[in-house]
Design a protein with these regions (language model features):
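A cross-kingdom feature marking charged/low-complexity
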Residues: 2-15, 64-89
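Short aromatic-glycine-(Arg/Gly/Cys) micro-motifs in beta-strand/loop hairpins
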Residues: 5-32
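Short loop-to-beta-strand transition segments
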Residues: 56-62
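A short, exposed loop/beta-hairpin motif centered on an aromatic-Gly-Thr core
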Residues: 31-39
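Short secondary-structure boundary/capping segments within folded domains
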Residues: 7, 35, 49-53
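A short, charged, amphipathic alpha-helix used as a generic interaction element across diverse proteins
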Residues: 40-54
Length: 89
């Protein structure tokens, strides 16, 4: 599939999760990301964008993969790029 043929369904279910942190640093040992918001991919992207930029590295979005543009777990810059794509469409 050519990149120009790629489509993203922003209406698919998704969850926004946040990693526990201390002093804005992710705690890794024995911890997992917890649910912050549940909705569509579009709603989770919007919710992510409301978070302070200084703490966005602690968040991730989980959704059904949509190759080649959407992976099961979306992080930082990937979320921002999808938001730009959504705004472009």
């Amino acid at each position: 599939m050519a990149e120009t043929d790629a489509r993203v369904n922003f209406d698919l279910p998704a969850t926004l999760r946040k990693w526990p942190s201390l002093n804005n640093e992710r705690l890794k040992e024995g911890r997992s990301a917890y649910l912050v918001f549940e909705g569509t991919l579009d709603e989770c992207i919007k919710e992510y964008k409301t978070k302070p930029e200084s703490s966005r590295h602690l968040y991730e979005i989980h959704t059904a993969p949509q190759p080649p543009l959407v992976t099961e777990t979306l992080l930082g810059e990937h979320i921002v790029e999808l938001a730009r794509l959504r705004d472009f469409l």
